[in-house]
Amino acid sequence: MSKKCEICGKSRTFGNNRSFSLRSSNRSWAPNIRKVRALVDGKPKRINVCTRCLRSGLVERPQFIKTTEEE
């Protein structure tokens, strides 16, 4: 699964771990990515989205219509 948001483009950032003696080792921070069904060009599609885009309402979710069959 890719660690990149398809809405805002947020991806991994890189930095260092710093020990008590101030030696550094490389590390990375990954965004909180969720795979959700969203409407893309009016059609439902499964995309990778960060939780900030989900919470801010930038993702339009498809509506599921419950059908009842009459007997």
From Swiss-Prot:
The keyword Ribosomal protein is annotated on this UniProt entry: yes
InterPro entries, A to Z: Bacterial_rp_bL28, Ribosomal_bL28, Ribosomal_bL28/bL31-like_sf, Ribosomal_bL28_bact-type, Ribosomal_bL28_sf
Ion transport listed as a keyword: no
Keywords assigned by UniProt, alphabetized: Ribonucleoprotein, Ribosomal protein
Organism domain of life: Bacteria
GO biological process: translation
Gene Ontology CC terms, in alphabetical order: ribonucleoprotein complex; ribosome
Pfam families: Ribosomal_L28 (PF00830)
Gene Ontology MF term list: structural constituent of ribosome
Family the entry assigns: Belongs to the bacterial ribosomal protein bL28 family.
Protein name (database record): Large ribosomal subunit protein bL28
Organism this protein belongs to: Finegoldia magna (strain ATCC 29328 / DSM 20472 / WAL 2508)
Name of the encoding gene: rpmB
